[in-house]
């Protein structure tokens, strides 16, 4: 009898974390590696937020809090939703967890029964399907190819819905593609979901504040007829460069929020009291950092997309948000690297690129779509220039 649970055997370690760890190991061994696999901003947390955390420590704010978040943080979250999304919530419709991933995991654990289906559009964030599996559910993968801009086709969505469908996960701006759903896109999806009142919607809005060129963010809870079926997840990690602080939150139906709190009460209990104090300042304080950072990301995106599209065999769409691009490497399949290894899959491409050129990216198949790779441009322009030169040279070396 194995000590490892059957449910754990269904899942795999996070590929994005694995790539980042591999890059670290190579660097530690003295190799020159540029890591473009990590999904975290390279900017420091703003000083006003750090000072709020220091004040909380000095004030002795170091005890347990309410399981699913302090009253003051929940109030700040309520105000955020009203101010930025024109959504009205009460504090008993808010939950706070140790990061957005934690909130989504809790939601799946709190709501899924064996055999319940969750529609996961691909390309997807790597953890969605495995969290569904851990909770006993069945992920239903809905492929969204580059011809669709990596976005859901409403007719294909409708074909994926069954009586067993409990959730659909929406992620805009998207990890890994940077694709963003316009208000019109969301309303088309809502038109389909309106026919199926048993389907709930988990909207992962963690990249809300990373959009470009005047893109107007719209979230599906803003459609009144669907709001009672929507759990809207967000957090401070990406917007305020607070990935290590581990604060995510969600707003939604009281029944689901209460169930999530029950799960959390028997697992992590409350998120860090210090991190919660910092998150209050992030949400209530100056928002100038967001605008400044978005400008930097847009410059990087423009450079990366242009450089990639100048490489024979690679094609890259121009994303409207997040800090990723998701280029195709299909034009390089069948070629051989300098060691004679034939590139048959995107995983072959990614491994050969790392081994031969010291650039770490993540294969598209890890996100549910073969023939692509993900680059995170959340690093310095200097690193990006070096990395793109290396990628270009590597591709030219293939024959």
Task: List each model region and its residues.
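Flexible nucleotide-interacting loop at or near the entrance of a catalytic core
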Residues: 61
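Substrate/cofactor-recognition hotspot
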Residues: 8
């Amino acid at each position: 009898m194995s000590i490892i649970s059957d449910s754990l055997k269904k899942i795999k370690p996070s590929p994005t974390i694995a790539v980042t760890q591999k890059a670290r190991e190579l660097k530690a061994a003295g190799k020159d590696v540029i890591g473009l696999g990590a999904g975290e901003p390279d900017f420091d947390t703003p000083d006003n937020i750090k000072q709020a955390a220091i004040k909380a420590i000095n004030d002795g704010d170091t005890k347990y809090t309410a399981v699913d978040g302090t009253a003051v943080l929940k109030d700040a979250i309520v105000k955020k939703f009203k101010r930025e999304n024109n959504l009205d919530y009460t504090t008993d419709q808010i939950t706070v967890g140790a990061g957005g991933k934690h909130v989504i995991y809790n939601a799946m654990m709190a709501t899924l029964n064996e055999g319940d289906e969750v529609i996961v559009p691909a390309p997807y964030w790597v953890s969605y399907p495995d969290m569904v599996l851990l909770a006993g559910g069945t992920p239903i993968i809905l492929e969204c190819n580059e011809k669709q801009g990596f976005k859901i086709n409403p007719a294909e969505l409708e074909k994926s819905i069954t009586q067993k469908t409990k959730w659909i996960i929406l992620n805009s701006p998207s990890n890994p593609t940077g694709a963003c759903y316009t208000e019109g896109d969301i309303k088309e999806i809502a038109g389909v979901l309106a026919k199926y009142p048993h389907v709930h919607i988990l909207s992962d809005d963690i990249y809300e504040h990373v959009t470009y060129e005047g893109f107007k963010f719209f979230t599906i809870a803003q459609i009144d007829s669907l709001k009672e079926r929507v759990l809207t997840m967000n957090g401070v990690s990406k917007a305020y460069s607070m990935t290590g602080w581990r604060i995510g939150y969600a707003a939604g139906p009281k029944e689901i929020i209460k169930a999530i709190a029950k799960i959390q009460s028997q697992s992590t209990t409350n998120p860090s009291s210090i991190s919660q104090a910092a998150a209050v300042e992030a949400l209530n304080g100056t928002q100038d950092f967001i605008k400044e950072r978005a400008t930097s990301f847009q410059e990087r995106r423009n450079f990366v997309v242009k450089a990639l599209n100048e490489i024979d065999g690679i094609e890259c769409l121009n994303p409207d948000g997040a800090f990723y691009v998701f280029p195709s490497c299909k034009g390089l399949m069948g070629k051989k690297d300098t060691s004679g290894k034939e590139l048959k899959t995107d995983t072959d491409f990614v491994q050969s690129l790392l081994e031969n050129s010291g650039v770490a990216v993540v294969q598209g198949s890890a996100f549910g779509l073969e023939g692509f790779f993900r680059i995170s441009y959340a690093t310095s322009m200097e690193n990006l220039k070096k990395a793109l030169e290396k990628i270009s040279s590597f591709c030219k070396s293939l024959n």
